[in-house]
Amino acid sequence: MGASCLEDRPLIKLVFCLKRLPHLSLEKFQTYWLDTHGPLVRSHAAALKIRRYVQSHTTENLGLNQAAAASRGAPGGFDGVAELWWDTVEDFASAASTPEGREAARILLEDERRFIDHSRSPLWISVEHPIVER
């Protein structure tokens, strides 16, 4: 999804590379993220003006992540990546400006603290530039 249907403008995207809390196994982390946090995000999406939310879960059992990182001399990977899209910068910036939006943001952050190690989980705001789409 490279552009919104509104005048073909690029969507604003938050990318969040996640590391689990040390006491959680990868399986417990991913199960909680998918089955508990995912529905929680869905329930607050309208209040936060979120257009799209995608979870990408690491597949450690294949050993491919370690091989890919080792081939580049890269550090160890993440346990997953969350991606959230908004139609405009204004939508993103104003998402928590209403009482409903502030409460939704508070609830989601409180839940994240149950399974995400925020100190090792970088996030950033971006605009996509699709290069290949088939």
Regions picked out by a protein language model, each given a short descriptive name:
Residues G2-R134:
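Macromolecular interaction modules
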